UniProtKB/Swiss-Prot annotation:
Function: Part of the Sec protein translocase complex. Interacts with the SecYEG preprotein conducting channel. Has a central role in coupling the hydrolysis of ATP to the transfer of proteins into and across the cell membrane, serving as an ATP-driven molecular motor driving the stepwise translocation of polypeptide chains across the membrane.
Electron transport recorded as keyword: no
Name of this chain's protein: Protein translocase subunit SecA
EC top class, as a word: translocase
GO molecular function (one): metal ion binding
Gene encoding the protein: secA
Quaternary state and interactors: Monomer and homodimer. Part of the essential Sec protein translocation apparatus which comprises SecA, SecYEG and auxiliary proteins SecDF-YajC and YidC.
Enzyme Commission number, as recorded: 7.4.2.8
SMART domains in the record: SecA_DEAD (SM00957), SecA_PP_bind (SM00958)
UniProt catalytic activity: ATP + H2O + cellular proteinSide 1 = ADP + phosphate + cellular proteinSide 2
Lipid bilayer topology: Peripheral membrane protein
Amino acid sequence: MIKAIIGKIIGTRNDRWIKQYKKQVLTINALEPTYEKMSDVELQNAFEELKKRVRSTEKNLQEKTLLEVLPESFAITREASKRILKMRHFDVQLIGGMVLNDGKIAEMKTGEGKTLVATLAVALNALKGESVYVVTVNDYLAHRDSKEMEPLYHFLGYSVGTITASVRDDDERLEIYSKDIVYGTNNEFGFDYLRDNMKYSLEHKVQKSHAFAIVDEVDSILIDEARTPLIISGPVDRRMENYNKADEVAKSMQVETDFTIDEKNRTILITEEGIKKAENLFGVDNLYKIENAALSHHLDQALKANYLFFIDKDYIVANNEVVIVDEFTGRLSEGRRFSEGLHQALEAKEGVSIKEESQTLADITFQNYFRMFSKLSGMTGTAQTEATEFLEIYNLEVVSIPTNLAIKRKDLNDLIYKSEKEKFDAVILKIKELHDKGQPVLVGTASIEKSETLHALLKKERIPHTVLNAKQHTKEAEIIKDAGLKGAVTIATNMAGRGVDIKLTDEIKELGGLYIIGTERHESRRIDNQLRGRSGRQGDPGTSQFYLSLEDNLLRIFGSDRIKGVMEKLGLKDGEHIESKLVTRAVENAQKKVENLHFESRKHLLEYDDVANEQRKSVYKFRDELLDINYDISAKIAENREYALNQIFSKLKAFDHQNLSEEELLGLKNVLKEDFNAHVELEDLEKASPIEKFVAEKLKSDYENKMKVLDSEQRSRIERIVYLQILDNAWREHLYTMDNLKTGINLRGYNQKDPLVEYKKESYNLFLEFIEDIKIEAIKTFSKIQFENEQDSSDAERYLDNFSEEREHESVTYRHEETLDEDLNVAMKAFSKTPKRNEPCPCQSGKKYKDCCAKSGPKKGLFAK
């Protein structure tokens, strides 16, 4: 109340921003007569001068220069638009362009020309010479907007590209991203970023920078889709026959002759005879060539499966599946699988079907993808209700832009009925009345199910209508455009048709414009406002009204008792409704509660993803270093060798490594043979002093002797790609482990432990293990690589080229779907303060806390049924 009074006296923060922007508008308008007099060539030359000025400025000062040239850039862009598009930017659109350039969100009502507004900020920021991304919610809008604005951009000397799901060719994508301005969907931009970080050449990466992005329908992308990460997943190993072949080879090998078993350390060491036998059975000349790395790995796992793991002790076979027996509890660990191909090796051993595991190869949330941009801005018709979240999560201020013409739409109070049947009966009557009159009506529903229900009722009444939901998404734009025709009745889910204007004829305006009927309040006020905003564009007349019932989800869970009591006191009969500002306010308060719950939920999930994001950035940075031909990969390998040896010697019992027992020396000899392919005689180890130096020099000389057949360029290339392969495999395994950790961490909340703290702690330890695994695995792999002659090195290069090509084009699945993180949120609620007795139960059953979890504790599966 006090805040509102102060706002009226001195103006709100938004008012002060608009006042500042209006001063700039006067400056831009003053330049209009000058540019109007110029020929097309003169106008283009003037814009080229701005490009030269900005690009000649030092990079860290370019933003300052952009602000200096903003009036000229906006004025030239407006003049060019008048000539090319026959559209002149209004003053309020100039304000919108400045808001976007400042890295804020421009809240502009439907029909205010957001597509044209974007051209001002895009043209200005593209002066720097870095690609500007314009992000939309679907392929149709990306294609439409880019094609409509392309002539303007071409006039200004810019190239334009559009990324859609239909662009499959990598070279074509690379070409599109080389353009000055790139339109595309949020999904395509996000997936391309992930794909870039799976490439084996810097030249193949399509996104060269993340300088500036304008996100259209920013609330939909950064709020509604914030909880659904982009995931690229794929099979762990596509060649399932390798497991069966390796199992055959392992079963044919003899203990002591072909391999030895170290039961104490649960390891197996293949002898020279065993290697020869395996090479013969696999049909290869050298098991440890790069191209045979997968076979040697499968053989290692098959030997472990056959000689170290035993049925009814380590695992059982049930229902054609291998089920792990927990070594500590003796219980079955259903759903768990051994990693690194061991589980598949056991399946091959037992003759059951081998499961091709699908695991996460790369993932990112939109929150973390878009926060990478140096400057980010957005546009939408509805952002103020989520202003706090935009600021806290993305550091984006929301600025409400005044409309060019006053809004004439009438927003009527909600009508509330006792039952859903009564509500729908009233809706059908209203639709029939409007249809008979010829006034177009757009009916918003909360789900496909409800739209189908309404469709059946209208069909029964023989009222012609069109249904728009996920089943007809390909016709979305066409259906929405026709929603303003005389007598049109359109049923749509609340989010349908965003970005498509419903234009009205003068006849329709005389009839009262587009009539909006909402059949249910959404959990978010913003979605309701979007539905209302379909009507009343650019000063058009229109009406909106919501029809509710006590059986609606929102009213059933929040506050329906009070409203129900009012209805009973009034003695309302079937079919009658109540209409009151107090009731409407009660519904909006219920929505605020739900919005706050969702905000806290998204904030918690982001805190979890931030942990993984820091790890992701670190890995991707190192990956880019490896891709750089100037990176000293040999020094990295030497560093890893030193680390691996330190780990080995640190595990030896004797403090003085010069006085190792014969058993320890024998163990060291076996480790050097098994892990590093180093043949060292026992007497040489006994005589060595200091032993660490002897072993280090032995491994180094063995490696350098192997690499002599390669020239420096070949060596660097092979080392970099092999290291990338090791890094990628380890990263995939790490993501798999992190997924498992996240799945189980939610239960800690019921033990009064903060799941987030536990997750941070354990994920950090896992990341340290991941780094250690890379170092150890790298040196093991490089130690086992063999090049006997130049032909071997050429074969290796060809293999690596094919491997890189296959990896970049491997069969993967792209997912952008709801995650199972609801459990996480419920756990957080369990950890946080207990709700009051009469508050809604946090398990979302719709009951009060005292009648639900307060009595019985959280329901099985965390959700009440």
